[in-house]
A protein has these predicted regions:
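Helix-enriched interaction subdomains in cytosolic or periplasmic regions
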Residues: 6-42, 142, 299-302, 309-320, ...
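A short, basic/flexible loop-to-alpha-helix module at the beginning of a structural domain
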Residues: 39-58, 93-96
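Conserved N-terminal Rossmann-fold NAD(P)-binding element of oxidoreductases
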Residues: 61-64
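Hydrophobic/small residue at the entry helix of a nucleotide-binding pocket
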Residues: 68-69
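Adenosine-cofactor binding site in Rossmann-like domains, unifying the SAM/SAH pocket
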Residues: 84-97
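Rossmann-fold NAD(P) dinucleotide-binding segment
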Residues: 96-144
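Rossmann-fold dinucleotide-binding core
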Residues: 137-199, 205-208
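An accessory alpha-helical subdomain
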Residues: 198-331
Length: 332
């Protein structure tokens, strides 16, 4: 069984909440404790190993396995009983030998070098599965299909390498060629606890423009603005509400990471730039409402967006309330 099964977890929580209520104990308290226990349990699974779904697989080669995401996949595959080899920058002279008997090759390199790296690969065994982990999918998928005539799969792990566990994490996948050959690998990822989401490469990149490029750019711009205004962070934190503190943490988190990664994500497509420009235009239109002092127009726009969100607005308010309580509990 996968370490995370949504239905199993939901059933257990519902059952324990019911028992707690019958005993006069707060169901929320019991759920909080159980979720903490489950989170620790998911993390500890990483030290125990996982079932091997394809025991006869030849060695897995991770190109760029020295990077953070490459090391994570090396760890998970090794814990699952597979033999893993690493192909790094200084190994290209031996690349043909390293991949000669590979059962799977995973390309885990920076976005701006992904297509070039795929093109540099020596010929792979006909049945070798070629996989990439880039956060853009259309161009890498086409490059893999052109470079290799065997099975091809595009993956995008929607989490950072510091996540600790794959339980409940989302892995997006784009079919390339011969899906029956890599179905076991998708199932192996599910055994690790991840949730799979299938989508076309084009749709993936369209959605990532909002989820990653626009969001990261807006966060970058806000951080840049704070720095240029030279605000006192200590004072902001002392005065902040739980929601602003959480927002500020998300901004600060961005600047604790690799700037090359975010430059690659934001600048990976001209479509990203076009979307950011439209956002900039709408920002300007909203500023126009302030300049005109037109509160009614502001309220009308607010209601329009509220209607667009529909039931999700209340759902997100409920979800965020839980997050804010947790953030406030962690406040020093």
């Amino acid at each position: 069984l996968p370490i995370y099964v949504p239905e199993r977890e939901a059933s257990m929580l519902a059952s324990r909440r019911k028992e707690a209520q019958a005993l006069g104990v707060s169901p929320d308290l019991i759920e909080d404790v159980l979720r903490r226990v489950m989170r620790e349990s998911y993390s500890s699974e990483n030290d125990k190993g996982f079932k091997t779904l394809q025991p006869n697989l030849r060695p897995v080669v991770i190109v760029g396995g020295g990077g953070q995401m490459g090391r994570l996949f090396e760890k998970m595959l090794t814990l699952s009983g597979y033999q893993v080899r690493i192909l790094e920058k200084n190994d290209w002279a031996r690349a043909a030998d390293i991949v000669a008997d590979a059962g799977m090759v995973i390309v885990s390199v920076p976005i701006h070098t992904t297509v070039e790296t795929i093109g540099r690969l020596p010929p792979l065994p006909a049945d070798c599965i070629l996989v990439d982990l880039a956060s853009v999918k259309a161009e890498p998928l086409q490059a893999m299909l052109a470079a290799h005539q065997g099975p091809v799969l595009g993956l995008h792990p929607m989490f950072g390498p510091d996540s600790g566990s794959l339980a409940k994490q989302v892995v997006v996948y784009c079919d390339g060629r011969q899906p029956e050959a890599y179905q076991w690998f998708l199932e192996q990822i599910q055994v690790w606890g991840a949730r799979l989401h299938r989508i076309s490469a084009v749709e993936h990149d369209q959605n990532m423009a909002f989820i990653q490029a626009l969001r990261h750019f807006a966060t970058f711009a806000y951080g840049l603005h704070l720095a240029e205004e030279n605000v006192r962070l200590e004072q902001l934190l002392a005065l902040s509400s739980p929601i602003y503190r959480l927002e500020l943490a998300m901004v600060g988190r961005l600047f604790a990471q690799d700037p090359q990664l975010y430059a690659d994500i934001i600048m990976s497509s001209e479509n990203n730039l076009a979307l950011i420009k439209r956002y900039y235009q709408r920002f300007g239109e909203a500023i126009g409402l302030l300049e005109q002092g037109d509160k009614q127009a502001f309220i009308d726009s607010f209601r329009k967006v509220e209607h667009w969100f529909g039931d999700y607005a209340q759902r997100f308010q409920s979800e965020s309330r839980t997050l804010l309580r947790q953030a406030n509990d962690n406040r020093q």
